[in-house]
């Protein structure tokens, strides 16, 4: 059910080096960013908007009936971009929960977007995110696959203790592939973007470590599959096959 207190923001920019113009690449007859927008709308959890500094992206989204907010071009991260967008879209501070959905997840399922709200039912949780169990050694050892190490709270829930590109944790038992979808309480997002980059964040190149180093609580919902991000031409062709393009 759509909540007026929830805002889904999709940060999108044209600066990808491996896939120039990535948000506007065609997948099954729609620009990639519009495919993501459609999935966020289908999740029916709140208002949905694209946050961008690119007029081309804004034009494509509005041409397909989506909402856009223009942001500055100099943001160091998607979190900073969505915070500016939140301030623009909600000056009266009625929004309580902000979802940060990457614009290169065209195959994400609407129910996975909604799943990120689950951990926020606990008022002690500042930030929610998702992960799926790793089933292959190739995935476990790939430094481009971010692993979340967490303390189990339930069969489908972890409390995050660390995120790493290394193969971890050691020993027998499941390992989890982190999915870059976040749900923030508004106050948590405000606090997060005000913090300077942290030592472990800079070392691992993972901005969520900034929150953990500051003592913020991140809980993780476990889902069955990892949505395929689009970072390479091969990823793009896979997404086109999945979506019938």
Curated annotation (Swiss-Prot):
It comes from Rhodopseudomonas palustris (strain TIE-1). Its main location: cytoplasm. The gene is kdsB. InterPro entries: Cytidylyl_trans (IPR003329), KdsB (IPR004528), Nucleotide-diphossugar_trans (IPR029044). Pathway: Nucleotide-sugar biosynthesis; CMP-3-deoxy-D-manno-octulosonate biosynthesis; CMP-3-deoxy-D-manno-octulosonate from 3-deoxy-D-manno-octulosonate and CTP: step 1/1; Bacterial outer membrane biogenesis; lipopolysaccharide biosynthesis. GO terms for molecular function: 3-deoxy-manno-octulosonate cytidylyltransferase activity. It catalyses: 3-deoxy-alpha-D-manno-oct-2-ulosonate + CTP = CMP-3-deoxy-beta-D-manno-octulosonate + diphosphate. It is an enzyme of class 2 (transferase). One of its GO terms (cellular component) is cytosol. It is found in: Cytoplasm. Its EC number is 2.7.7.38. Belongs to the KdsB family. This is 3-deoxy-manno-octulosonate cytidylyltransferase. Keywords: Cytoplasm, Lipopolysaccharide biosynthesis, Nucleotidyltransferase, Transferase. HAMAP family: KdsB.
